[in-house]
Amino acid sequence: MFDVTVSEGVKLNKSTFRNALAREGSFVTNWREQPWTGVFGATLCPFQADESLDVPGLRQYITELTHADGMQGLVCNGHTGEIMSLSPAERQQVTRIVAETVADCRRPIKVISGVSAEGSLEAINHARSARDAGADAILLMPPHHWLRFGRLSSTAVGFVKDVADAADIDVIVHQYPAWTKAGYTLDEMKEMVRHERVVMIKMGTRDMARWLYDYERLKAVAPDVSIVTCHDEFLLPTLLEGADGALIGFAGFAPTLLVRMVHAALDGDLAAARQCQKTVAPLARLIYNFGEPGCGAHQRMKVARWLLGRFPSPHFRRPVRPLTQDAINQIRGALAELAITL
């Protein structure tokens, strides 16, 4: 049960929380007391040389991430975790391993599992599998055939509602970039956040001109639903414009640094956040090459952590090919120049 204490010691469950906040005309200001705010690190997925899952390596990596004080949640089976190369059974296996490892750390860290499916029934089944494996929520991606063909507004809203109605697990809506045919409109998201099981929007719109406008209007409709940035390349600007946290692959790469930076921004400590940004910026250029997360980012993350002795292997699953030796040498040189300690 979702419970929160607000002014005058009144305790509300989630079913009445939105109405109470609307009557007060304000939001709960202490973000640290909220269940879906802060830093949610998207995790990498290690493979053996034969392309099988590296289970011991995954446990070791997740254990390290749990040691980042202040990490609010871990997100497996995202794009950073190469969900598209994992079978449904492997996605559930990865979720179970992450949930078991988090449970062993004896600190409350939420487990979120990505769901990518082409239809409502398949997505519901995958969401239930994640729930059964120990996930606290799912990250619901839009069906990828929308990227090519688009969709009707009723289809977009209906897809989220179908899964939220039937899966019996909290839902994080993954907003894709505005330039794709799979991104949601503001009106569509306003419908989605009204659903009881929708707890967060991972706001990947990448339209900075609309960021604050959309944030304020979504919070007006559903103040208890977190709006978090996934803009690794615009992390500090989006946090300062208006965000309740960050759900990013970069936090699965440099967890302690990213927790420190996001927390400073959420606390309003601009000087500390900008100091962190001085270290984050060159790392982001190394991983993202001045752009948004793309097809090669998780490769560079894996190789960089492996070169630093912080990841079990640099292996990928086909059709992804290994980085060239020149690319590996470039990463090695950049890491040496930056003298980074993750």
Feature locations, PLM:
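Acidic, Ala/Val/Gly-enriched low-complexity intrinsically disordered segments
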Residues: 3-10, 20-22
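C-terminal alpha-helical cap/extension of soluble enzyme domains
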Residues: 21, 27-29, 38-44, 64, ...
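Active-site beta->alpha loop and helix N-cap motifs at the rims of alpha/beta catalytic domains
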Residues: 24-183, 321
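Short secondary-structure boundary segments
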Residues: 43, 78, 142-143, 205, ...
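Short helix-capping segments at alpha-helix termini
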Residues: 101-109, 134, 167-169, 194-197, ...
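Catalytic alpha/beta core domains of metabolic enzymes, predominantly
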Residues: 177-284
